[in-house]
Design a protein with these regions (language model features):
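Catalytic-core "active-site belt" of small-molecule-metabolizing enzymes
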Residues: 1-162, 166, 170, 178-203
C-alpha cells in the first residue's frame, strides 16, 4: 500500500504558508507505517516542538491503473473519508531552508490519520463535498471540493502518470486554510459533511 499526498491544493492554504500556487499537483508520499487507524492512540512525536494538523479528504483506490485518462479516473476510487496529515512544522522549516526532502517532517510513524470509510456512489461526485475539523469543540478548518485547485480526477490522472496505482492505495487530496499547532490533550474531530468520521486525542 502506498500513501500519496497532495500539497498546496487550496489557494488560501498555499498563501497562509507563503507558498506559490502550483500549476500542477505537488505530490509527496508516506510509507504504510505512517497510517494511524481510527480509535488508535496518537502520541506527540518527541522529535518535534511544533506539531501542526492538516485536515484532508482522503480517497481509497479500488482499481489498479497507470496512465489513467481523466474522464475514466472516477472509476479508480470507491471510498472517501476525512484524515489528518500531521506535520512537524519546525522540522519541515529546517529541511526547506536546506532544500532537503520533507519525509522527516511528514512521513513518520502514525502521521497519517484516517477516519471511517464512506462508500462512493456516482451521485456523490456530482455535487460539492464539504468537510471540516474541530479542535476541542471549536471549528478550525472548513473545506469544500469546489475550492480545490486540482479535482479528484485530475489528481488521480496526474499521480498515475508517474506511479502505478494499486488497490488499497490512499490519496490525501490537500488541506484548506486554517492549519495550526496542537498540543498534548487536544481533541480533534473530523467531519464529512455533517457525519463525524473520527475523533482523536493527542497524548
Amino acid at each position: 500500500m502506498k500513501i500519496f499526498c497532495i500539497g498546496r491544493n487550496y489557494v488560501e492554504h498555499a498563501k497562509e504558508l507563503g507558498n506559490e500556487v502550483p500549476d500542477e499537483p505537488v505530490i509527496f508520499m508516506k510509507p504504510k507505517s505512517a497510517l494511524l487507524q481510527s480509535h488508535t492512540p496518537f502520541y506527540y512525536p518527541e522529535f518535534s516542538n511544533e506539531l501542526h494538523y492538516e485536515a484532508e479528504l482522503v480517497l481509497r483506490v479500488s482499481k489498479n491503473g497507470k496512465y489513467i485518462n481523466e474522464r475514466q479516473a472516477s472509476k479508480y476510487y470507491n471510498g472517501i473519508t476525512v484524515g489528518i496529515d500531521f506535520t512537524a512544522r519546525d522540522i519541515q522549516g529546517e529541511l526547506k531552508k536546506k532544500g532537503l526532502p520533507w519525509e522527516k517532517a511528514k512521513a513518520w510513524d502514525n502521521s497519517a490519520v484516517i477516519g471511517k470509510w464512506k462508500e462512493i456512489i456516482p451521485e456523490m461526485l456530482k455535487k460539492p463535498i464539504s468537510f471540516s475539523l474541530n479542535k476541542n469543540g471549536e471549528n478550525v478548518q472548513k473545506g469544500i471540493t469546489t475550492d480545490m485547485i486540482f479535482s479528484f480526477d485530475q489528481i488521480v490522472t496526474n499521480i498515475s502518470n508517474y506511479f502505478s496505482l494499486n488497490i488499497g492505495d490512499l490519496i490525501y487530496t490537500g488541506t484548506p486554510a486554517g492549519v495550526g499547532e496542537c498540543v498534548v490533550g487536544d481533541v480533534f474531530e473530523g467531519y464529512y459533511e455533517q457525519q463525524r468520521m473520527f475523533e482523536l486525542e493527542i497524548k
